[in-house]
Amino acid sequence: MARVTVEDCIDKVDNRFELVLLAGHRARQISQGAQITVSRDNDKNPVVALREIADETLSPADLKEDLIHSLQKHVEVDEPEAVTEFISHSSETESVLDTSREEENCSFDYMSEEDLLAGIEGLVVPEKSDDY
């Protein structure tokens, strides 16, 4: 192939935009040292990537899966759900109820809006330094 265009590859990948994404991803792989599957013929990496797709030496589905995997930052792993155990003894139930009653009796200090404003007014602004 003398020149590879998008038209040569459109029958392999239906969407032109997806084709460009896949070819760009493959070109980045080649620049990072991946083995090429066609002869280079003094072509640049994007042209080599398009030639690989046109010659079907690479599967577009595999390239798409690899592109998706490379873009993911957080991969969700299906973990089995924890099995809930039911309490069968009444003494255990009473101890659980006692701890919940203790939590209800806890009190927190609340600040009124006036106290908050008074505290903000009392703050001292730090001196400006030339470190910025």
Curated annotation (Swiss-Prot):
Recorded catalytic reaction(s): these are: RNA(n) + a ribonucleoside 5'-triphosphate = RNA(n+1) + diphosphate
Q: What is its EC number?
A: 2.7.7.6
Q: Does the keyword Transmembrane apply?
A: no
InterPro entries, A to Z: DNA-dir_RNA_pol_omega (IPR003716), Pol_omega/Rpo6/RPB6 (IPR006110), RPB6/omega-like_sf (IPR036161)
Question: Which GO cellular component terms are attached?
Answer: DNA-directed RNA polymerase complex
Free-text function comment from the UniProt entry: Promotes RNA polymerase assembly. Latches the N- and C-terminal regions of the beta' subunit thereby facilitating its interaction with the beta and alpha subunits.
PANTHER family documented for this protein: DNA-DIRECTED RNA POLYMERASE SUBUNIT OMEGA (PTHR34476:SF1)
- Quaternary structure? The RNAP catalytic core consists of 2 alpha, 1 beta, 1 beta' and 1 omega subunit. When a sigma factor is associated with the core the holoenzyme is formed, which can initiate transcription.
The similarity comment for this entry is:
Belongs to the RNA polymerase subunit omega family.
Q: What is this protein called?
A: DNA-directed RNA polymerase subunit omega
